[in-house]
Amino acid sequence: MIFYNSLSGQKEQFKPIEANKIKMYACGVTVYDDCHIGHARTYIAFDVINRYFKYRGYDVTLVRNITDIDDKIIKRANENGESTTELVERNIKAMHDVFARLNILKPSKEPRATETIPEMVAMIETLIKKGYAYQGANGDVFYRVTKFADYGKLSKQNLEALQQGSRVDVVEEKENPMDFVLWKMAKEGEPAWDSPWGAGRPGWHIECSAMSKKLLGDTFDIHAGGSDLRFPHHENEIAQSEACNECTFANYWLHSGMVKVNAEKMSKSLNNFFTIVEVLEEYHPEVVRYFLASTVYRSEINYSKENLENAKASVERLFNALRDIEPIEVNLPDDASEYEEKFIKAMDNDFNTPEALAVLFSLAKEINTLKTTNKYKASGYAYLLRKLCDVLGILFTDIEEYFKQGDGVDASEIEKLIAERTQAKKDKNYARADEIRNQLQQQGIILEDSATGTTWKKG
C-alpha cells in the first residue's frame, strides 16, 4: 500500500509502527457552528480510508478530537446570549447527527479539548523548561519558533520567508511575530482553568498535541486533516510535539482537498456557503456521500448541481444493479476475485476512489447482464458489490427505501392512497382501486400485491 505523505511530498510505502495496527489522529471540528460541506468532504475522505484499512485487516485506532474551547466558540456564545457549554453541546449533537446520516463511522476515541487541560499544561511546562516557550509581559505563554530548527518542514517554507510574508497580528509581548500562543490569560467572563501562569485557557495548537500524545503516544502512524490546516496548525503541532517529546510526531501526514462551489472558493462572504443540513434537504445522504467520495481524497472537489445530479445518477445505477437480486456469498463465481483484486489495486495506490468506483460499475454491469440468464452467478456478484460498496461506505440505505425518497415523492401520501385502495378492494369498489393504481403508476410508483399486503417502489 502506498499513499502520498505530505511530510515528504511524495508517495511512500506504508509501514506501520506495529504490525497490523494503525494509530491515526484526525483533527476534528471546532464546534461553534453547524458543520458545512467542507467538513463532510474531510471526514468522509478519512472515513473511507479508515474503512479501507479495516477491510485490509488492520486494527485501527482512530482518534478524532472535538475543539470545545476556542475564541470563535466564546464569541458565538456571547452573540447568542448563551453559555459556551450550551453552544458546544448543541453543536456536538448536531455534528453527530449529520455524520451518522452520512454513514461516517464513529472514531475509536473522541476526546474534547477541555478534558485534556492537565496534559496541555504539562506539555507547556516542559516546553518552557527546554527553552521552547516563554511567558510574555501580559502573562500569555508563547512558543519560540526560532528555537525549533525544523519549523516549516511540513509546509515546505523556511522561517525567514514566513516572517517576511507574515500577516500574523503583531503582539508586543512576542519575541517574534511568528511565535504562537500556548496559553492565554483569562479575560473577565470567559471560561478559565488554573495553571502555573495564572487562570486561563489553552491555545488551539497545543490542544491537538496533548490529545494525540495522551491517546496515541509520542509517535504514531498517521496524522490527518484538511489541507487548510497544514499551515499553521499542523506545522505548529509538529514544533510543539517534537520539541517536547524529542522524537518524530507522526510518520505520515494525509491532507484532504478543499471544496469549491461552482469553481469558486466556498465562503460566507461569497454567499456560496452550505451547511450539511442544507445540502441534505435537497439531496439524499447516499448522493452526498457518493459525490464527496468520488474524487481522490487530496484533490479539490467542485460542488455544483451538475456534479450532484451526476452522483445521483451513479448511485441509482448501483442500486438498480442490486434490485430484485439477493446477494449470496456462497454463489461467488471463481472469477470474482479479479474484480476484488482490481479494487484493491486502485485503493492501494493512494486510495484512488475513482478507479475503485469504476470496478464497482463493471460489477454492476455484469450483474445486470446475468440477472436474466444466470441468477445464481448474479447473486454471487451482488454479494461482492455489496461488500466493496461497504468499504467505501456507500449504498447503506435499504434499496426500496432509497427509491421511495426524493423527486417530490411524498411517502405518507402514497401510503394513504394504498390504504384507500385496500379498503376499496374490500368494498368491491374495483374501479376506484384501479384508479388509484393508475394514478400512482403515472407518478412512477409501482404497486406489488401479495398475501401480506401491498408494497410500493419507484419504477
Curated annotation (Swiss-Prot):
One Gene Ontology MF term: zinc ion binding
Source taxonomy: Bacteria, Pseudomonadati, Pseudomonadota, Gammaproteobacteria, Thiotrichales
Give the enzyme's main class according to its UniProt record, as a single word.
ligase
- Which EC number(s) are documented for this chain? 6.1.1.16
Q: What is this protein called?
A: Cysteine--tRNA ligase
'KMSKS' region (motif): residue ranges: 265-269
CDD domains reported for this sequence: Anticodon_Ia_Cys, CysRS_core
Please give the superkingdom of this protein's source: Bacteria
Any Pfam family hit: CysS_C
Q: Provide the species name.
A: Francisella tularensis subsp. novicida (strain U112)
For the ligand (Zn(2+)), the binding residues are: C27, C208, H233, E237
Swiss-Prot/TrEMBL GO biological process terms: cysteinyl-tRNA aminoacylation
Q: Which gene encodes it?
A: cysS
> Which SMART domains does the entry mention?
DALR_2
**Cofactor binding note from Swiss-Prot or TrEMBL:** Binds 1 zinc ion per subunit.
Q: Which UniProt keywords apply?
A: Aminoacyl-tRNA synthetase, ATP-binding, Cytoplasm, Ligase, Metal-binding, Nucleotide-binding, Protein biosynthesis, Zinc
